[in-house]
């Protein structure tokens, strides 16, 4: 797992994600990913708990990308430290 408490690593990822998704093509790709990963749908599948877990994982990918798009590297590092995600 990537160490999101390391500011140097986070700055690099932040730069790459923003370079990718803050373009017209990147925004179109994000819209596609949101639709494909069920971003706007409930993750709960009352008939299949494994499907709920899969749905949550798909949405986690989008949430992570959006976190990098909507927050500064410093904010991301602070959030990771708060969650204790430094030893991945």
Where are these regions (language model features)?
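Intrinsic-disorder/low-complexity detector
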Residues: 1-88
């Amino acid at each position: 797992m990537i160490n999101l408490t390391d500011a140097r690593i986070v700055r690099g990822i932040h730069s790459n994600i923003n370079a990718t998704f803050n373009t017209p093509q990147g925004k179109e790709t994000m819209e596609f990913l949101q639709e494909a990963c069920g971003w706007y749908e409930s993750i709960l599948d009352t008939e299949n708990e494994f499907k709920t877990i899969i749905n949550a994982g798909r949405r986690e990918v989008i949430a992570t990308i959006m976190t990098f798009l909507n927050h500064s590297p410093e904010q991301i590092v602070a959030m990771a430290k708060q969650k204790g995600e430094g030893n991945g």
